[in-house]
Amino acid sequence: MKPMKNLLLMGLLSALGAGGALAAERSHFTHFITRDGATLKDGDKVFRFAGIHAPELHRIEDDARGPCRADPRGWGQYFKWPTAQEQQNWIQAMVQTGAKAQRVYVLSVQQEFDKACGRETHILAPETADGMPRLNEKAMRVYDNMIAEADKQGLRLILPFIDHWWWWGGREQLAAFYHEKAEDFYRTDSKTFKAYLDVIRQVITRTNTVTGRAYYDEKAIMAWETGNELEDTNADFLHQTAAWIKKWAPHQLVVDGTYKKINPFALTDPNVDIVSNHYYTNADNNHPGQVTQDLRAVGGQKVYLVGEFGLLPADQLNAIMQSIVHSEVNGAQAAGGLIWGFRGHRHDGGFYWHKESTGHYSYHLPGFAKEGEANQEQAVVDLVRTAAAQMAGQQTMAPLPKPEAPLLRETTSPFAINWMGAAVGRSYDVERAASPTGPWTVVGRDISDGVNEWNPETMVLFRDDYRQLQLGHTYYYRVTAKNESGRSAPSNVISVQHSEENQPPVVTLEPALTTTQDQGVELTASWQDDGLPSREVKVGWQHAGDGQVHFCHADRAQTRAWFTAPGTYALTFTADDGLLKSSKTVTVTVGEAAGKAPADFCRYHGEVYGVAEGRLTVM
């Protein structure tokens, strides 16, 4: 497009865009990020960054719920939209640990199993057979807030459009709207490619409902990426896509979102600013030397970025990150690198998490040495913070700021107290009072919310001590966050009336059993408890007789017993919650041996008996 026509077009878009541009709030950034040869610039300053890749700033894969069984692919997950407070917290955690830029995951595409799994997506099927895809307004408002929050807190964003893969719905699902194949996405004469371009147009020209600005005027958006790991990108596809993005967003950069290689045609495309690669072991490029290899291939013609790498031990990740920081070819260096991958605080306590097929978990900020030990979490977070500091010309990472106050959530039980953790909080103290103004008593110290595989259905951050509370009384709680730099101000105060009276465990047991001496008997009891005064319930079997009964494991609900003589025996199972207990008795009638007794009754037929069985019902 000729320059004059382009200027007229952008002027028209600005006039139509946020119905006012006069109503748009002022950006917290002074400059768009620009490209100067092989270097990114913020104004006249070189812009480089390191971080932990945050794929889910705009859509959450809620692993705690497990896979959706209605999705026959087997791994199909449940998804939900993050709350505004979650987005604010996550971005704050990144910025306060040194991040200057972040790449998110793609826009999700509707597919056939979404309805059965209750999933919502960013891109919806067209309303007519050959119509264009539609943007889901609910989803895009979450996207709006992500961009607004990034602007407010000083984080630049790299935003890819469509996925090569089908995890969130990608090119295959887009093609399905038009009864085409996944590979048609890369054909510039296909209906799928036409739809892809229209999605790009709709997104870039969208008016942000939070800031009032058109997306193409958002300085927080550093770059648009053609997609995620588009490994079949060809010259015509990239040429048309990059030109289309620049047509609508002339002030923002364009990333060739390819994978496993540097496309020579990207280096000569005038509309491509950044070339990217992802390093993974299955791509045979997950090593420090790949940085120099790619920089040589780029030859200083474009900015080079390592958009993702990871799923390695911390020492190997550090070697790659240090190569990203220091490698140089004819004066050109990588602009940045992002380790896969981050998950943030949950709105109502704990962290989201994800476990890769390699066994690696997502990383939590600011890093948790004990809870993340198996994942080397603290070492990984620290190596990233160090790299970010080095890129900024510093020798060591800056200390964390003191945490801000956590957000204590309302509850109906003093035994289910949760809070949204501070962005860089490492541990928490819980205080209780009899009035909303104190005096306050610390009732919980050094509580961590960094547990991996957090399940909000079964876990809570803090349970008060039942023995210290009086039934019917109202208590007040507040929480403070701590890290190595200090302590936060107290959280908001909540009030809770203690109305839960401890009930004894409920035991279920068969009343009578019959066996012979050579068989012994399998004993199976079950119990339910209200979780008070704690979640610990001691169980046990006993016989008040003359020692002729032997238990494999008397302290387990399921076990075996054997008898030294025929007779009738009363075996009692007891469940004790520490304050109250319940018992039931089974009468076992034992006849004379009908065969040879086993050498070991506790390994009867090769099975080991004694598995504990019980259930807590938390009220």
Where are these regions (language model features)?
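Residue-level recognition of secondary-structure-to-loop junctions
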Residues: 469, 541-544, 551-553, 561-565
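Pro/Thr/Ser/Gly-rich low-complexity, intrinsically disordered linker/stalk tracts
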Residues: 390-424, 471, 489-501
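Beta-strand-rich modules
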Residues: 469-485
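Recognizes extended acidic, P/S/T-rich segments that occur
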Residues: 429-470
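Active-site mouth of glycoside hydrolases
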Residues: 26-274, 278-286, 292, 297-302, ...
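Substrate-binding cleft of secreted/luminal carbohydrate-active enzymes
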Residues: 305-391
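Low-complexity "stalk/linker" and mucin-like segments enriched in Ser/Thr/Pro/Ala/Gly
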Residues: 449-457, 542-556
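Extracellular acidic, Ser/Thr/Pro-rich low-complexity tracts
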Residues: 421-426, 483, 526-532, 545, ...
